[in-house]
Amino acid sequence: MYLSFYITDTKNKLIFQYLLGATAPSFKHLWTRVQSTCPQLLEDSSSDDYLDHSMVGRDLEVYKYFSVINKLNYWCLASTSKSKGPLDCFTFLETIDRILLEYFDKDKLSIKKIVNNYDRISLIFNCCVEAGEPNVSDMLYVNKIKEAVPERSDLSKFISSTAHNLQQAVQLPQQRQQQLQQNQISRGSNSLIENEEIVPWRTSRASKHENNELYVDLLETFHVVFEKKKSHLRLLTGSIHGIVDVRSYLNDNPLVAVKLNTMGNDIGIPSLHDCVEINDGVFSPSNITFIPPDGKFRLLEYSVDLSSQVKQSGVRMNSIGLMSLHFQNGLGKDSDEFELSLNIENFKKVSQVDDLKIDLQFNVENADPNEIAYKIKILRNTHGRFENSIIMGQGQWIFDKSTATGTVPVLRGCIEYENTGPNFTKKVDLQTVSLEYSYIGQSASGIYVEAIDIVSGLTIGKNTKLYKGAKYKTQTGNFQVRL
């Protein structure tokens, strides 16, 4: 049973809290308890000591879910249950994160957005939680939440409107009240007819747009680890996680067909929105038909196992995501220099790579790293700047906000040892290189939207236009090259 929910920033500063009862603790009290009983919950998600849930009292457990998109922490305090595991709570927190994005029609939620809409978010939690349990009815559809929590009204307007209606009801004569009730019943029956649902995730009342618009956004995040073998790279493990989001602003109740060309990739069994029609239990990415919800929603999620595809095809994979990387150790007269070169492929649909950062990890060969003191000195770099870490043996090559495709950035440096004698034989090598970047215009797997068609159910007037299109974005998850 859920007792309370909290939203904090990455430094665990409170932004929002929703308490389901008078006995539910504030985040200040919960924070004190967490500090004393399970401080690992306060660690960053990348830390080795990080915990995502822990007991904080008798029959009390706290969960912490980190939203990668919004860079926010979602906390939940719940009573322990033998019938439910941690996955239930994390799934619900992930669903709440998605609902907030779709409700506000945003790609990312800012702290200011949450603070300015505190009352609406409280009402959204009220819709999604019933008697301390997730509301498993149709309320988890965003269109239902938008009906219960209007986007252009706040809590104060609800209260003032209710008070005004009550005052009018008291002042009206009994005869007038009866007439008013009859009119309300008549209007209510007409309203039910007007707002009759074709599908539970869409109502006709919600679909009143000046123009008809339908946009598909395909985002892929890839995770790969390469091993350097002489002058070649060998894929150790790799996968791609893809999501297809849709922004639909269509009138009436149209039937939409999206054709996805997988370019020979095996996307397995994808996770689908309830709106997707499945014929004879078989899903075909080349013909995805659905009556869309109104606004932003996630159409499907898929995964591509690069490791198995490379193994089955027997084709060597040296690069992915427009990038191929090569580095060498033992260069220079004293064999203490290294060079790293990056080939950013020239692609017609991609003009630039954004937020490129490369982490370098050095290692001492056959020795304890603490026994040798050294620093990294840069001799030449064609792009960006290099920053040494406070941790010895680590540094970061930081590029500008955008880097043009078709370029070959090069970084050359050397290892400067401290307090070395004439018989010093230890060697420091560049061991691991990690890349982080993103780009727009192409997916890493090559998957693309072949067609977006309105099959039926859409009436386009003389002054109404239809706009549709697709956008692609690729970003790195974990991209490593190891020696």
Curated annotation (Swiss-Prot):
Residues 211-482 form the MHD domain. It is a peripheral membrane protein. It holds the Pfam family Adap_comp_sub. It comes from the Eukaryota. The keyword Chaperone does not apply. Keywords: Cytoplasmic vesicle, Golgi apparatus, Membrane, Protein transport, Transport. Adaptor protein complex 3 (AP-3) is a heterotetramer composed of 2 large adaptins (APL5 and APL6), a medium adaptin (APM3) and a small adaptin (APS3). Present with 3410 molecules/cell in log phase SD medium. Belongs to the adaptor complexes medium subunit family. Part of the AP-3 complex, an adaptor-related complex which is not clathrin-associated. The complex is associated with the Golgi region as well as more peripheral structures. It facilitates the budding of vesicles from the Golgi membrane and may be directly involved in trafficking to the vacuole. Required for the transport via the ALP pathway, which directs the transport of the cargo proteins PHO8 and VAM3 to the vacuole. This is AP-3 complex subunit mu. It comes from Saccharomyces cerevisiae (strain ATCC 204508 / S288c). The gene is APM3.
